């Protein structure tokens, strides 16, 4: 609209000025000065229009953000919740059931198993069987509708959520990276982590080599959701973050499913280091991913 109005205004001024010059009411120099001034005003007016559009977009985004922030959490600490104390890292699912809605068909029903400290438990089965749902119940992303889940004998619904999630690391198929530097993305694994600790975690995750090859190294910005990195690079940064967090319980949700063969081999080597000494629940479709598991559960 501003472009059209501006064009009409300039055209009208030129036409009027030409008519007045022809009638001897204005000098040509006056017309040139006036038109030049008008043209110089076009860009600032356009900038104001652009600024208004950006402001409106920002206000709409703020409204969505505030709506999200004001949404009450469905899963909160229960009265009297205590901090989780992990001594060994044994995980027990006892007759666990879950449905996404009250009247919905149960996604899980009567699931019971024990993952002893340091064991790797593989969860396999067709898509939609509830494998990802099963591991998402452990950090209480969802709340089990029946049964109990315990860590070292402590029911997770009776412990503080922050302490529970500090004890669990998750590496999923889609790595969550922020539009920040590589060092900052790895550092999210542990508050106040030193640069040296971040670099050690990256080396353990087989990420240091490709990071050092980047122009800015650990200070390279990864872009929104890590879109400046390949899938394998994103996964190794996510693994480095889990290495840095050093939680006793590890959840792997198809962490290598979307990778090519070369990237998968690099990531799998890093995952084997990450699993060492940790109680691990693995969701996978490839048999190569679960061949070293202590127990394979079919859903």
Can you say where each PLM-predicted feature lies in the sequence?
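Transmembrane alpha-helix boundary/anchor motif
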Residues: 9-16, 43, 60, 206
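Cytosolic ends of transmembrane helices, especially the final helix of ABC transmembrane type-1 domains
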Residues: 40-68
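A hydrophobic transmembrane-helix motif
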Residues: 1-33, 55
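Small-residue-enriched core segments of transmembrane alpha-helices in multipass membrane transport
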Residues: 7, 33-44
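ABC-type nucleotide-binding domain
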Residues: 77-78, 82-299
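Conserved E/DxxT/N motif and adjacent residues on the DHp alpha2 helix
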Residues: 67, 74, 187
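Transmembrane alpha-helix boundary and packing residues in multipass membrane permease domains
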Residues: 15-19, 63, 254
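Residue-level signal for transmembrane alpha-helical positions in Major Facilitator Superfamily
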Residues: 6-13, 57, 194, 248, ...
């Amino acid at each position: 609209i501003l472009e059209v109005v501006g064009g009409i205004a300039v055209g009208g001024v030129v036409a009027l000025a030409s008519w007045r010059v022809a009638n001897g009411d204005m000098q040509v120099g006056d017309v040139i000065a006036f038109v030049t001034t008008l043209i110089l005003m076009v860009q600032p007016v356009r900038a104001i229009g652009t600024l208004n559009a950006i402001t409106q977009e920002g206000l709409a985004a703020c409204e969505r953000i505030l709506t999200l922030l004001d949404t009450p959490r469905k899963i909160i600490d229960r009265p009297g919740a205590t901090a989780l104390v992990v001594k060994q890292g044994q995980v027990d699912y006892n007759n666990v059931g879950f449905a996404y809605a009250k009247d919905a068909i149960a996604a899980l029903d009567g699931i019971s198993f024990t993952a002893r400290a340091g064991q790797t438990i593989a969860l396999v089965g067709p898509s939609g069987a509830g494998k990802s749902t099963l591991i998402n119940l452990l950090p209480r992303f969802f709340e089990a509708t029946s049964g109990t889940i315990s860590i070292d004998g402590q029911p997770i619904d009776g412990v503080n959520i922050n302490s529970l999630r500090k004890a669990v690391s998750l590496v999923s198929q889609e790595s969550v990276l922020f539009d920040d530097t590589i060092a900052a993305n790895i550092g999210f694994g542990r508050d106040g982590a030193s640069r040296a600790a971040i670099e050690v975690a990256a080396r353990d995750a087989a990420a240091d080599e490709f990071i050092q090859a980047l122009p800015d190294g650990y200070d390279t910005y990864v872009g929104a959701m890590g879109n400046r990195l390949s899938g394998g690079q994103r996964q190794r940064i996510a693994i480095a973050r889990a290495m840095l967090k050093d939680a006793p319980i590890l959840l792997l949700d198809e962490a290598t499913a979307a990778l090519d063969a070369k990237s998968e081999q690099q990531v799998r080597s890093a995952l084997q280091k990450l699993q060492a000494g940790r109680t691990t629940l693995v969701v996978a479709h490839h048999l190569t991913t679960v061949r070293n598991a202590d127990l394979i559960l079919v859903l």
